[in-house]
A protein has these predicted regions:
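Detector for methionine-enriched segments
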Residues: 1, 101, 128-129
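N-terminal amphipathic, basic helical "cap/leader" segment at the start of enzyme domains
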Residues: 1-67, 73-76
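Generic, low-specificity signal for short hydrophobic/alpha-helical stretches with a mild N-terminal bias
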Residues: 5-8, 37, 51, 82, ...
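A short, mixed-charge helix-start or loop-turn motif at secondary-structure junctions
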Residues: 12-13, 82-86
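Short, intrinsically disordered, charge-balanced linker/junction segments flanking boundaries
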Residues: 20-27, 123-131
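Small-aliphatic-rich amphipathic alpha-helix that forms the alpha element of a beta-alpha
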Residues: 29-30, 69, 77, 84-125
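Short, glycine/charged-enriched secondary-structure capping and boundary segments
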Residues: 58-60, 84-85, 127-129
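Short coil/turn connectors at secondary-structure junctions
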Residues: 63-67, 109, 130-131
Length: 131
């Protein structure tokens, strides 16, 4: 709710009907809000001093963090909307990154989204991220 006591439009549920099913642990681990649950993304952790230094060479916005999570979209594995050919890899990766950030916040830690980076330089610094 906002300060006026009204719900934010983005928070309102978009689900109109629910089915009652028991949720198993393995099923819960696989659930993700991605297009048809394709999960076309990968997450890399940059934590060593060397990795953090290489990452800092790709952006001016590291804010002294000691760990970085790089979320990459896998276009070849994503759902593509048939009406217009729209590939949802970037949307799905953004959803995953947002949920990771919410989980980090839930642990009492902070995070920030950094979109201003040199993508070709990042690929050069971390060739294992290719593909």
């Amino acid at each position: 709710m906002n300060s006026s006591g009204h719900a934010f439009p983005a928070v309102r549920s978009q689900t109109k009907r629910f089915r009652r099913r028991r949720c198993t642990a393995s099923w819960r681990q696989r659930l993700a809000p991605t297009a048809v649950n394709k999960q076309p993304f990968k997450v890399w952790v940059a934590q060593s001093a060397d990795a953090c230094e290489r990452l800092a060479e790709t952006t001016n916005y590291t804010f002294g963090a000691g760990i970085f999570l790089i979320v990459g979209a896998k276009e070849d594995e994503a759902w593509v909307r048939s009406y217009d050919g729209r590939n949802f890899a970037d949307v799905d990766a953004a959803i995953a990154a947002t949920h990771i950030m919410l989980a980090i916040q839930n642990e009492g830690l902070g995070s920030t989204w950094i979109g201003h980076f040199d993508a070709p330089k990042l690929k050069e610094a971390f060739p294992m991220m290719e593909g």
